[in-house]
């Protein structure tokens, strides 16, 4: 099985190994015991390994690099508009090759993944929403949009969304 991770977590390659934030990689390594090939779509901006980086425990990794982006200033908005076609393409082609799509949310890349996964209704999908799932929480617009897409069973065929805590009035694909 080819497993694809769409994530905003910054990565670094050292000695033919891909490393990222250790708690996140530790969790992913649990999943990777059951996959033949791993595709990662994420930023690769790091220049040095840090004490909190850990390597993925997998031998067959394909990495599609995407740039980080934000929309905090006018200049960054213009840069982001220019980068979006490339990011959308990287996410789309990775999803096309995957048997199972795994989104890491909330985050900018996770939002793009949540939107693109709609065109792959027959693929098995999971999303880990590692933020506050409380619908009453004061959150950025992009986080609320991600939660809406992920909870919408019309848009998320074959997807299970893993969230922290149990919340009232949730759709059947939301799993605490």
Where does each model-flagged region fall?
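A short, histidine- and acid-enriched strand-loop-helix "catalytic/donor-clamping" loop
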Residues: 11-15, 72-74, 128-140
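Short, well-ordered alpha-helical microsegments
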Residues: 47-49, 109-113
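Short N-terminal targeting/anchoring amphipathic segment
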Residues: 91-109
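Active-site proximal beta-strand in glycosyltransferases
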Residues: 1-9, 116-135, 175-176
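N-terminal subdomain of nucleotide-sugar transferases
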Residues: 1-52, 155-156
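N-terminal strand-loop element at the rim of the active site
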Residues: 37-74
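Short, well-ordered alpha-helix to beta-strand connector turns
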Residues: 35, 97-99, 157-159
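Donor nucleotide-sugar binding/catalytic pocket of nucleotide-sugar-dependent glycosyltransferases
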Residues: 134, 141-176
């Amino acid at each position: 099985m080819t497993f694809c991770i769409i994530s905003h977590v910054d990565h670094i390659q050292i000695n033919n190994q891909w490393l990222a934030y250790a708690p996140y990689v530790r969790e992913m390594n649990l999943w990777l015991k059951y996959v033949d090939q791993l595709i990662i779509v994420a930023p690769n901006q790091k220049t040095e390994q840090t004490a909190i980086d850990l390597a993925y425990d997998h031998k067959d990794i394909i990495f599609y690099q995407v740039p980080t982006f934000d929309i905090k200033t006018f200049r960054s908005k213009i840069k982001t508009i220019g980068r979006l076609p490339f990011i959308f393409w990287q996410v789309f082609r990775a999803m096309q090759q995957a048997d199972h799509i795994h989104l890491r949310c909330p985050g900018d890349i996770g939002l793009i993944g949540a939107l693109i996964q709609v065109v792959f209704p027959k693929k098995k999908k999971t999303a880990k929403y590692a933020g506050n799932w409380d619908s009453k929480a004061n959150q950025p617009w992009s986080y609320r949009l991600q939660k809406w897409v992920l909870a919408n069973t019309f848009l998320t065929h074959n997807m299970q969304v893993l969230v922290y805590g149990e919340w009232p009035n949730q759709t059947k694909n939301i799993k605490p």
